[in-house]
Amino acid sequence: MIAEVIIDRAAKKLNRTFDYNIPKDLEDLVIIGSTVLVPFGNSKTLEEAYVIGIKETSSFEVKDIAKVKHNLSDKQIRLAKWMAKKYFCNVSECIKLMSQPGTKRKHEVKDKKINVIYLKKEIEEIEIELQSGKIKSEKQRRALEFLKENEGATSNEVEMFTDCSKAILKTLEKNGYIEFIEKKIERDPLQNKEITKTEKLKLTEEQENAFNKINKTIQENKYEEFLLYGVTGSGKTEIYLQLIEKVLEKGKTSIMLVPEISLTPQTINRFISRFGKENLAVLHSKLSIGERYDEWNKIKQGNAKIIIGARSAIFAPTDDIGIIIIDEEHDSSYKSESSPRYSAKEIASILAKHGDFPVVLGSATPDITTYYKAQKNEITMLELTKRANNSTLPQVQIVDLKQELAEGNRSILSTALYEEIEKNLKDKKQTILFLNRRGFSTFIMCRECGYTAKCKNCNISMTYHRFENKLKCHYCGCEQKVLTTCPECKSNKIRYFGTGTQKIEEEVNKIIPNATTIRMDVDTVSKKNSHEEILEKFKNENIDILIGTQMIVKGHHFPNVTLVGVIAADTSLNIDDYRANERTFQILTQVAGRAGREKLPGNVIIQTYNPDNFSIDLAQKQDYNEFFDIEIALRRQLKYPPFCDIIIISFTGTNEKELISTSEYVYKYLDSKMDKQKYNIFRPVPSPIDKIQNKIRWRMIIKGNMTVKAYQDINECLTNVYSKNIKHTKVWADINPNSMI
C-alpha cells in the first residue's frame, strides 16, 4: 500500500503530495490523518509528514515510511484540504492547527510524572516488625507510620511531615518495605481556582424566548445559526450557560469561543462556578506548552465536555460537538492575521453544517456582515433589548474637544470629565478611563525643522515610553534612546506629541492627586497572571481609577464602576480602513457598557474632535439599527463587504527590484485569468506602511464575489510564483483581512 503525504514545511512548492510505501509492520497503524516520519530529499534527518490519502500503487520509485506518531481523523484532513484552498495556504499549515500541542520533535512535551511511595509489605507484617523492634531507626519508624495512613504520598511530603531524608527512604526501599511508583499528573491551569458554586438564574421573557429557540435545535440535532443580539448587560452569558447545561444532558461537548483579550479569570470563573472545573478545559495562548498538551489530552480522552478558548479552540479534538458559541462575535481576533489566515466563524459554520448542531453568535454590536445576513434571513436573529437585572443603560455625553481648547482647557481631561471623576471620588465609586493607544506620547518631532523620530527598521513613528525612558516601535519592538537634540538640525526644540495610556496615568495623578490609579495595557500585562492581578486589585483594593486600552473593555463586570471616560474617540477613526466607522461605534458602545451594570446609574463621557461623526453620535445614542442603516448604505455604494469579498495580495522582501517584478507578474497573471466584469483588480502599489522590520511592503487589491474558479486562479498564481525560485520576496493572499494596512 502507498501513502500520499504532505511534508510538514511551509514552503509553497511543497504544497503537494509525495508517495511513500507503507511497510507491512505499519499497515495497521497508517490511516488517513496519520502523522508519520519519512526520509525526504538528501536530508539525513527524518521529516514529519501527514498522510492525506492511501492508494494501491505508485508510478514512482518510493521510500518507506519510517515511523507513525499519532493520528488525526479523516474529517479533520478534509477540513484541512478545504481550508488550504479557501485561505490560500499549505495543507500542512492547516493540519498543524488540529495537531496536539507539544508533539513536534524540536519542542516535544512529555507527560509530567512524579514518584509516589507505596508500602511493599502488608500493613500487618509492618505492624509486627515495628512492635518487635526489628526496625530500630526512629526516622524509619516515623516514615512507615506516616505511609500506613498516607500511601501515594510524594518523597517531599514524607520528608516534610516526618523529618526524614531521602537516604532514609532509599534504605526502606532497599529493605523491601516501600516502593517508588511513577505517576502521571496533569498540568492544570485551573488548579488554584476554588470557586463557590452558583445556581442558574431565572431567565427574563426575552432571554427565555431566545433560549427556547436555540435549545429546540440542540434537542433536534439540527444545524442553524443564530445571532444573539443583546444590549450590554442583557444576560447573554446566562443563556450560554443554560444552553451548555442542555448539551451536557445529551452527553455532548460545547465549545465556547471568546476573544483572547476577554479570556479573563472573571469569564472562566462563571463557568467553573456553574459546572465545576473537572469537566472544563481551557485553551489559549497564555498557557504553557505543557498545560496546552494536557488540556488537549483531556479533551481528546472525553474528560472535558466544556471547552472555553480563543480562536484556535475551534480545532479542539472532539467529535461529539453539541453547540458552538462565539461571544463578542464582532471581535477582529476571530480572524487570524498569520497563515493560515482563517476565520473561526467560518470554521464553526462548516463544522456545524456537517455535524448537525447550532452555532450562536453573540454581540451587543454585531459585525455588519453578520447583521446583514440576519436581515436577509440567512441566520436567525434573536434580540435582547433590556438589561437582565433591570439596570438602565448609562447616560452618554459627548464633549467637543475643539470647544474645550477654545475655552482655554488644554488638559487631557475635559471640564465635564474632571468634575464627574471628582464627584465619583466623593461618592466612593470607581472610574474607567479608556484610550486605545499605549505608551506616553505617540510621536516625537523637532519643532525647528519638522524631523520625526522613526523606527530604523519600519517606516513608522516611534512611541515614547516614559517609565522606561525609551522610544519603542510597536511593529518590530525596536528600542532607542530618547532624543534631546534633533539629529537633522541639532536643535533642542524636541517635543512629544499625542497621548498614550502612560501619559494619561501621569496627568491624572497630577490633576487628581488624591485618587489611586492603576494602568492596564500590553506593557503592564506581559507577565503570566498580571492581567488577573490588576483586575483583582481594581476590584478589591479600593483603587479609584482604572486606565487602559481595549483590554479593559472585554469580559469584565465591575459593580462599583459608575463612570467611564473615553479620552479620544477619534483614535480608531483615523485609520486607512473601510471598517473605521464600524470599529469606532463598536468600541465606544462596548466601553460605555462597562458603566452602571448593577443598580447604580452609569455615566459615560466621550471626548472627541469629531462630535458630528455618525458613528460617535450614534454610539452616544446606543442606536445600532440606525448606525447599521447608514453604514450598510455606504458599503453598498462603495462596494465593500458584505457586497463583495476583498482579497489583499501582499508582497514583502528586501530586494525591491525582485519584489516589484514579482508583483507585476501576479497582477498580469490574475488580470488575464479573472473575469473583469466580475472583479476589480487593482495594480500593485506600496502598502500604507511601506516598510516593517527592514522589509519593503507592497500590496494589490481584488474586489468581487469569490467563486470556485477565482479561488483556483489565485491558488494557481501563488503556486506559479513560488516555482519561479524567488529568493528575497514573500507573497501571500488574505480574504477579507482584518487590516487594510
Residue ranges and their predicted role:
Residues T198-T204, E208, N212, K222-I660, ...:
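Inter-lobe coupling/hinge segments of SF2-like helicase ATPases
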Residues D8, P23, T652-T654, K703-N705:
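Solvent-exposed residues in well-ordered beta-strands and their adjoining turns
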Residues M1-S363, Q375-S391, K673, K709-I741:
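Accessory, non-ATPase domains that flank or precede helicase/AAA+ motor cores in DNA-metabolism machines
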